[in-house]
Amino acid sequence: AYFGPSAFIDFIHSLQLELTGADVSFAAPLSFDAKIDKGDITISDMFSLYKYENMLYTMNLTGAEIKGFLEESYAMWTNRMKSPDDHVLLLKERKKGQENYVSFVNFSFNFDSAAGIIYTVDVTKPKGEKITILKMADGKPFDENKTYKVALNSYRGNGGGELLTKGAGIPQDELKSRIIHSTDKDLR
């Protein structure tokens, strides 16, 4: 999911869109290095991939808020590349004892992507200009002034990661009024 398509994230998006009837889905990989070995999938495998308890929310967001959300997400994860030698991901060097290593600047569970829309990310552009939403996944036009139903987890829907507050510009005290449905069971 950090470098391109991810079957797991595609699966999460598909489930969220199907279960909610939403127009757009937001989801994060949640873990950078989790893996499932070949063979039967167990409940514990799923918990290693999706370890946090969350409900599934459906919220009302405008097209402009969706774009702002994605701008914030990708600004937290992608460098503004000025040359082919620059890292795509926003990384920082750290030292642990005698060892040097590189890690993400931000938590992996705050890197959301979207489904239900066709969009591009230009990593040579600054925050606010990285995201271009071309159209809805069904080919219909995307309208920044229209209100869309968006599926996302409750951590994000309650303001976690600040993608809705700082990114979309929705005041924290308004988030609850944007929720149009919540599951009564944990997503896992």
What positions do the PLM features span?
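Catalytic centers of hydrolytic enzymes
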Residues: 1-188
